Amino acid sequence: MVLKRKIYDKLLEWKENSQGKKAIMVEGARRIGKSTIVEEFAKKEYESYIIIDFAKKDKNVEEFFNLYLNRLDDLFMMLGTYFGVKLIPRKSAIIFDEVQSFPQARAAIKYLVADGRYDYIETGYLISIKENIQDIVIPSEERSINMYPLDFEEFAWALGEEQLIDYIKNCFEKREALERGMHNKAMHLFKQYILVGGMPKPVSLFVESGKDFTGVDAEKRDILKLYRNDIMKIKAQYRSKVLAIYDQIPGLLSQHEKRVVFKTIQEGSYAEQYSETFFWLSDSMISNECFLCSDPNVGLSMYEDRGYVKCYMGDTGLLLSHAFDENELLESEIYRQILNDKLSLNEGMLYENVIAQMLVANGHKLYFYTHYSEEKHRNDIEIDFIISNNSKLKYKMFPIEVKSGKRYTTNSLTRFKGKYKARIGEAYIIHPRNLLIKEDILCIPPYMTICL
């Protein structure tokens, strides 16, 4: 099934605004659905299109670019003939799928866009690492957009719950709690989202099977194996570090502080030694990094301390499968026990990861904050996330605490508010209960994160 994705509207906006003057690059992790959505877009929005999958390493196609880039009439004739597609000026699109596999095609975008006859859509993965850009000039005629796993809203669409999403958004705008039955329904749907995740194939299997978890876990494990295989192809000098961080993500997130303690990975190691590691993980979009903001203000990035980092899995459904033994396939019944709260597991790990995933999908860069009290000899403030680019109050920051249980204190967030009162637009606690306002803090259920 072809899933409805928000990125489709971004592609439409690009097509209407660029009028052939810029190509668009869709970046995203493997198996995120890049190829599917761009081909669906080309099919609906153009009279004809060619999709070139450079991962197939077709020597004939590569030779066309090597021989005819200076003779574009010949290049287009060869491509049209080879793929059996009639290209129509200003009414056809050419898709460069997995363009990182043939960087010369990406470099050619400069000349192809200048020619102006066709629109160009690229998809890429790991497009910024040195191996994929060292011999080319990255074209300025290229606009880049990120594609993520399905967010909760897209997951709800896939299950036919558009009206529920509209109701959730309406309640958030009015600062009203959902009707109890609707809240329970939304929480049940959200738990399904945590377990299945947002990777298109597992979601499609879940929907098509009538919400059966059979096959979902196996599909997720196939994706995890693909990620591990990609890591094993990295240059030897930092392969082991990437693998160490990747393997430790579930363990790190199950701890109280959740941040990476580098000396526990290898004795005597420190953050600077892992800069390439996190660059690879970030560029692959396998994980979402959250850095310490040492002095929370509107310009959060100005006070970013990369020596302190939390590393979340890019997809929470994958995190769940990754947290169990790789060779131990989770039966559908296990998923149902988790869904119905009959099997105990670290919900805090999953909740914080899924909130990170949803914030990133909304365009936020992730930051956290801690304050160590010399008097108490411990952290007396711990803020899980801070965001700043809210459209209504864009010059303020918004601290977020994530609570997986229904009973909790607000001490940490209250202290943070007292310390940085003038800089804060609104403070949020994300909890499993319905919407309520507590001590001037807006407490919202996790599904309302789509509104932040």
Label each PLM-derived region with a short phrase:
Residues 56-89:
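Short glycine-rich substrate-engagement loop in P-loop NTPases that contacts/grips substrate
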Residues 15-25, 31, 40, 44, ...:
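A cross-kingdom feature that marks ATP-driven nucleic-acid transaction machinery
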Residues 2-18:
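Pre-Walker A adenine-sensing motif
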Residues 111, 128-144, 156-161:
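Short regulatory helix/loop adjacent to the ATP-binding pocket of P-loop NTPases
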Residues 95, 119-125, 146, 155:
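Structural recognition of the conserved hydrophobic beta-strand(s) that form the central parallel beta-sheet
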Residues 34:
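Conserved lysine of the Walker
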Residues 43-61:
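Conserved catalytic segments around the Walker B and adjacent sensor/switch elements
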Residues 160-351, 365:
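Interdomain hinge/linker elements that couple catalytic modules in large macromolecular machines
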